[in-house]
Amino acid sequence: NDSVDPPENNSYPVCTIKNFPNKIEHTIHWAREYFEIFNEAFRHIIKYRDDRLYLNSLSQFDKNKVIDYINIFCKSPIDDWTDCLYVAKDIFDQNYLTEIKQLLYCYPKDHMVNGELFWSNGKRCPTIYNHYYSSTIINFLESTTKLLCNIYGIIEDFTREELMQLVLDFIIPNFEPNEDVKIAKNDKELKEMKNTNIESVMINNIHFKDHYFPQEFEKDD
């Protein structure tokens, strides 16, 4: 039963925060945790850029995380704010499109477990955006682009209107469900998955910058 998962951080089960948030407090907690990526990811990237043997010192789970960071933040040259916008789009697509679609592929809206709807008893079935034009999404893309400009050391010389003109040309990526992906229903399953030996694959043609400026956040702000 998901309601008795072992608590972690403010008594919220990790699996609830990661896969099945159902309260505003869960989403705030998720967002605060995700903010840490803009610090943690780039510190790992710097270490790998300076020492290609760095990954050998990590567990398979942490190694996969770093490879995923590199694949997101270093797959293309970053020279101006528009490049940062496309990285922001990739972040949005991964978190709010691909992962949600994979979640619904694993657990469809009508999925049943022991004669009961899976999406019940505190689980709220997510909905998917099929466009980028809501003010909420524009706010996300604008804020993330500015944040990435700070990290990459790029001047934020753009207006919201200029950003929106580029967003009008954005295309929703095709989704191909991954048959091998398993999504934990509770913290016990999540812990077991962390111990698997599945390896992430690093992309070719990595583009590192000479300087990164990881961003730190005060969680109480």
Which residue ranges define each predicted feature?
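E1/E1-like adenylate-forming module used to activate ubiquitin-like modifiers
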Residues: 1-221
